[in-house]
């Protein structure tokens, strides 16, 4: 306790020096030779003492005054220290629903600089408010069963704010047509990775974002992590480790040695198809072996050579099995449309934080065959944006990037996501994780699921009936103290009645109450604030609703038309062949 606080705490007791001082003065001035005489004439003593309003500075009087004040202070201290601690009205819990006053410090006065959570609650986009105690990260956990309105009540209102760049998972492929026209009106660059209909997708080339050898290893890790077969062990065996070496060697070779046009997954697949190992002839060299032999002669310390040399330590039979595993893992790339999709890059992932951009990732919600491509993209996106913020913008992107990850469980596993979500806040990046139940997160991220949830300052529950989710939400809401009134009646030879009152603790909402919650209601929880039971956001009341296809079918966005228009625009970085025409002939 600092000196200033201690002084202020004891200051009131200095006032008691005066009455004790006057009491001592009255006793001293009272006529009488002994104690009984002075007590009998104490009235005369008070008359004499109070004739002057000033404190008596006679040493005995002053000492008694100070001693009296000290004794009184000690008595109050001891009484408070030994007093029983009562929490009247909150004996079993103090949980309650939040009010408008509770959320007010966390909302921006400008409606469009907020994230709409419910009809009455919003959270500001400002990462550094005037009062630091009101700072919250913008990571949001949204939980809602099928049909609870995750897209309508959360995704669409978020996009209509148009205050950030957005990367939005679109499981049904309906969000882009319904919101795209509005975003184009707001001068957004619109990107689309369509893994349902490849012909309606922009090109995505993972190799276009490799800047160093560590990026090669990150890409290989993400590729292997998201192309595991059903029931495959989470721990790697020696074959998977050998595959890792092989992919690293091939991608390293492509990145260092191939032309710009060849730096893509098609070249990687061609190299794998040209690879061969023979059980009966370990001296046999495939075309790929010859490529690496030539590279080793020229640069023996080359990154790709080192990786390939380790891979070739295996025997011929083992190498053949590894190559078969590589072919099986990359089997989806045998589809020509997917190969064409990854021929070159149009997504420009590293520029999302430079200017307002909306990237829609369209995934199938019934078939996860190509979802690994989205997981690759997200893994690269996080690393690219963090590096861009650190290397070019002093740690903070000029445009906030919001990732609205609808059906997050279908995306696949994003490498080190539990670590990324804890660090992206300072770079002006945030993630909204949208799930049908909290158990989905634990299925994919295992023990790291709790870390991910813990780094989301906001939780929005739209309804559901999955048991573990209901239990978690009920516990987070806490308990309130209620009054219990019991009435009893005993019948015998005489009838007697009894009344009793007691207090009990009750969950703010029990699991069964959560399960039958009104479909128009939702629960919003913000770290450090009481939870809110509110109406879901009414999309039709958003100021920009009239620009959506929901309001007017004429606003449907045509991505194919948009892509044709964008590809027709000449960019400063485009290259062309120049031919001279002889006009004299």
Language model features by range: what are they?
Residues 54, 97, 239, 255, ...:
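A residue-identity detector for tryptophan
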Residues 421-523:
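Conserved ATP-driven motor cores of ASCE-family P-loop NTPases powering translocation/secretion/packaging/pilus
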